[in-house]
């Protein structure tokens, strides 16, 4: 759904062998595997709206100009007691913990340990994991990888998180704003652009350590923020997250430490990158 008009709905799926992966859960039910597929039109051409094709096409254009793009996502989600609401009609989180809470033996700590172990076992490197601000809210950050690998890893990540939650008798949701009174969940994404071995965003002589390429990259993100939002914010609930604090972007602007800005540039000197 959403790829074409109804008169063009027949499509082909071409498995990408490089994404073959044995799924390590539910081993008592027999092993299963998965591969990501590229979407093709009936005549074998890449479907114009296939997300992997769209990303690959942009990365190829960047490569033709000598650039390589790396991304590093921080993925937030809530752990709930079940997929059913509580007596008051609200979802019920698994705990009432707060930011960076790490109580040994807690449901959230055990969950993160098991999820990270499973991800690492599948070849997906994890950089950090911790409890977030909301009750039952957690974050797991994946290590930087090329943009297409990251995109595939995020899709695998979502399945892993839901599988681990189900195995532990809980329910994981990536809903942007499941609670009106608690912070929403997002996926802050760090973007780095390299030209060979050099950070294309970094200029030590600039006031903000930003190169011309970095400034133009930010300008493009801000200029096309409305169009980008049509892809990244597909639901009414998505926009409920954007106002009311909670470190969610509220303004089409850029800055450094102001988390209400759409784009931030962390001041890590030569490690400067763009964070959305």
What are these regions (language model features)?
Residues 1-271, 275:
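Glycine-rich, acidic/polar active-site loops that bind/position phosphate-bearing ligands
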């Amino acid at each position: 759904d959403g790829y074409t008009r109804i008169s063009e709905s027949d499509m082909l799926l071409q498995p990408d062998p490089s994404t073959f992966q044995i799924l390590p859960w539910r081993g008592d039910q027999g092993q299963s595997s998965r591969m990501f597929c590229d979407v093709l039109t009936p005549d074998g051409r890449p479907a114009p709206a296939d997300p992997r094709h769209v990303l690959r096409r942009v990365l190829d254009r960047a490569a033709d100009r000598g650039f390589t793009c790396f991304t590093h996502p921080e993925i937030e989600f809530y752990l709930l007691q079940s997929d059913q609401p509580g007596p008051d009609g609200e979802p019920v989180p698994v705990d009432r913990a707060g930011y960076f809470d790490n109580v040994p033996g807690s449901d959230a700590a055990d969950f993160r340990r098991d999820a990270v172990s499973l991800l690492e076992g599948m070849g997906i490197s994890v950089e950090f994991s911790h409890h977030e601000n909301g009750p039952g809210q957690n974050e797991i950050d994946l290590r930087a990888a090329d943009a297409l690998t990251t995109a595939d890893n995020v899709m695998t990540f979502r399945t892993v998180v839901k599988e681990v939650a189900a195995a532990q008798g809980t329910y994981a949701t990536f809903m942007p704003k499941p609670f009106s009174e608690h912070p929403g969940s997002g996926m802050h994404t760090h973007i780095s652009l390299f030209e060979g071995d050099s950070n294309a965003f970094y200029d030590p002589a600039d006031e903000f350590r930003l190169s011309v390429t970095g400034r133009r990259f930010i300008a493009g993100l801000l200029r096309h923020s409305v169009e980008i939002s049509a892809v990244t914010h597909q639901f009414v609930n998505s926009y409920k997250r954007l106002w009311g604090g909670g470190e969610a972007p509220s303004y089409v602007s850029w800055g450094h430490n102001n988390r209400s800005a759409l784009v931030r540039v962390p001041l890590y000197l030569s490690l400067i990158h763009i964070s959305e």
